[in-house]
């Protein structure tokens, strides 16, 4: 990597705790480096994103406050319930109304963990990628593997 103009930033100890958030670490980092027009963060735990995904995200940024990589949720949240002991507590009205056919339930997406992009000044002002005119780039599931557990590592190894 010596031929690349890359500066490694080691996260301070207070940003390497269970309570610390990536967003807070990024905002603090922005205060320590030279200012740019935009700030983009690529999470190392989502290594299968490709250059075309990043280009698609960058192309949306001129018309947005921020751009976030997204992936389709395999299970719809509208079928979610809370369990209290053995009591089932439906969260959404559709379960009580018998509307459970997933073919007719709206699809939901979640951040894939691959990247977050935003305008520098906007991020410093709002400290949030989800405020304003937020755009999403849908990344296919095979490139949206967010590796956080040993099971995720095993799944990622199967993809290699």
Please describe what each predicted stretch is.
Residues 65, 125-145, 150-160:
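Catalytic donor-sugar/metal-binding loop of nucleotide-sugar-dependent glycosyltransferases
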